[in-house]
UniProtKB/Swiss-Prot annotation:
The gene is rps27ae. One of its GO terms (cellular component) is ribosome. One of its GO terms (biological process) is translation. Belongs to the eukaryotic ribosomal protein eS31 family. This is Small ribosomal subunit protein eS31. Binds 1 zinc ion per subunit.
């Protein structure tokens, strides 16, 4: 297994027989790059894409 591959399992959970993502993917970078969750925004560490959370 690649270095850090164990930590990717934190972003998924199993509900019944399905695997569900906990975080969103970056729309610019594509699948596999998750958006980091901050207090007021979601941001991509790779390309800098930011979505602000609605109040």
């Amino acid at each position: 297994m690649a270095k850090g591959a164990e930590s990717i399992y934190r972003y998924y959970e199993i509900k019944g027989e399905k695997v569900v993502r906990k975080k969103k993917f970056c729309p610019r970078c594509g699948e596999g790059v998750f958006l980091a969750e901050h207090k007021d925004r979601l941001s991509c560490g790779k390309c800098g894409y930011t979505e602000f959370k609605k109040k």
